[in-house]
Amino acid sequence: MPRVEFTDNSVAVKEALEEACIAYLHEAAGELTSQTVRNSRAVKYGRHDVRGNWKYQVDENKLEATVGNPLEAAYWEELGTGEYALNKDGRKGWWVYVEGNDTPRSNQKYYTEKEAKEIAAFLRSQGLDAHATKGTEPNRPLYKAFKSLKAVLIRRAEEVLGARMK
């Protein structure tokens, strides 16, 4: 009777699968980041370069990729502010903000449109970069990027993982 010999390739297969996953995560997160940058508005928030601060990070141990932006303004860009906030949970009414003073005060005052514009004009006359607003509409650059790339990224994952496993 012929002798059957079993060769355990599970370690090599697991390593190849892990390498394929890591390569794919870098590719997918890089593409998602690039599309998010393209979807972002050019310097909407004065000194904040939201567009130029989108980055991705791959945790090779967890086989996870994260796309994000360290700027608080990226949150505003994604979800909107004030009366235009995506979940309708923003401030209501007009307020004045000074560029560079990003953290809202707990005693934030609200005004009529006319009052807010007059106060902003006065502050600008004092050399401050002041603006009257009732909010900013959400742009959703990350959400739009994910939505537009989801099917492509799934197909690409199948290609990359399938090619490495042959």
Describe the residue ranges of each PLM region.
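Short, Lys/Arg-rich flexible segments
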Residues: 1-74, 78-166
